[in-house]
């Protein structure tokens, strides 16, 4: 069972993902490196938590868009 992320991690991750949609994607390592450059003074653990949530958030958005396209094509 996974752990629950703090609200500030979720909020920060969602804000960054929405603000920079072309920067972040569904690859954790790439997201982590980009975050390390954007926020050099944040701890490694926090960077990993934010990068993990951004990755998950990006995958969910991609799946949701795919589902909507499929639903629209059926109608």
From Swiss-Prot:
GO biological process: translation
The entry's keywords: Ribonucleoprotein, Ribosomal protein
One GO cellular component term noted in the UniProt record for this chain: ribosome
SUPFAM superfamilies: Rps17e-like
Chain's gene name: rps17e
Protein name: Small ribosomal subunit protein eS17
Family annotation (InterPro entries): Ribosomal_eS17 (IPR001210), Ribosomal_eS17_CS (IPR018273), Ribosomal_eS17_sf (IPR036401)
Keyword Transmembrane helix: no
GO molecular function terms attached to this record: structural constituent of ribosome
HAMAP family attached to this UniProt entry: Ribosomal_eS17 (MF_00511)
Family recorded in the similarity comment: Belongs to the eukaryotic ribosomal protein eS17 family.
The keyword Manganese belongs to this UniProt entry's keyword annotation: no
Organism: Thermoplasma acidophilum (strain ATCC 25905 / DSM 1728 / JCM 9062 / NBRC 15155 / AMRC-C165)
């Amino acid at each position: 069972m996974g752990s629950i992320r703090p609200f500030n991690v979720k909020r920060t991750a969602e804000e960054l993902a929405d603000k920079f949609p072309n920067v972040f994607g569904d690859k954790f390592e790439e997201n982590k490196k980009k975050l390390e450059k954007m926020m050099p003074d944040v701890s490694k653990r926090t960077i990993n938590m934010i990068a993990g949530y951004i990755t998950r958030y990006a995958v969910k958005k991609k799946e949701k868009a795919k589902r909507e396209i499929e639903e629209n094509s059926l109608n």
